[in-house]
Amino acid sequence: MKPIVMIILENCPHCKNARRWMEEHKEEKPQYQVLQVEMIDEKLHPEVIQTYSYYYVPTYYVAGVKVHEGVPTKEIVCSVFEQALSKN
């Protein structure tokens, strides 16, 4: 299992949707329940996000590699989870 980092802004509507979809996926697919997502709010932790390269939130990194940036869909969130579970 690979680590997931999600960069967000607290009041971002797209971030709220992504968080809701993450919870829905975890309820629908038991294999996703083991996944831990480290959420970093760029406003609260500007010193941490300086090490990441992105323009839009939410942005997902899996094992240190950016896998999605910007407006997500439920399918994109599923893809992020699948990448975190993959052996490659």
Task: Annotate each predicted stretch with a short phrase.
Residues 1-28:
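Local sequence-structure signature of Cys/Sec-based thiol-disulfide redox active-site neighborhoods
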Residues 8, 31-46:
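Thiol-based oxidoreductase modules, predominantly thioredoxin-like and allied folds used
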Residues 17-20, 51-52, 72:
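Generic recognition of short, well-ordered alpha-helical segments
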Residues 26-32, 85:
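Alpha-helix termini
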Residues 61-88:
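Non-catalytic, surface beta->alpha helical segment in thiol-disulfide oxidoreductase systems
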Residues 51-61:
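Structural micro-motif
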Residues 20-22, 31-33, 76-77:
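Non-catalytic interaction surface on structured domains
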